[in-house]
Amino acid sequence: MSAPVPRLEEVARDLFFFRRPERWPAWPYLPVVRRNPDGSMDLGVLYDFEHTSGRTGYGCTVFLCNVVFVPDTEEELIALPREVYDTFEEVSSARWTVD
């Protein structure tokens, strides 16, 4: 069974939030979820490094963890498993959506 194709409005909404950390309700984190064809879910977070520590290179990185259990430090966050993308469009294409 293949994953359902997201509607254009849903993709536009996700891209809007991916690009605007000032709109993230749990700033500096944005919880994201990927719903798999088998019914399981992958949980992750985007983290606003730019406006916290100024680190670069992690803007389109999904850290694989539940937002409730994010580590206390950036170093611990960076040590988590992650999926790295070049653009937010790629994040969306990998089926990550705002949770």
Task: For the regions a language model picked out, list residue spans one by one.
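Terminus-proximal functional modules
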Residues: 1-99
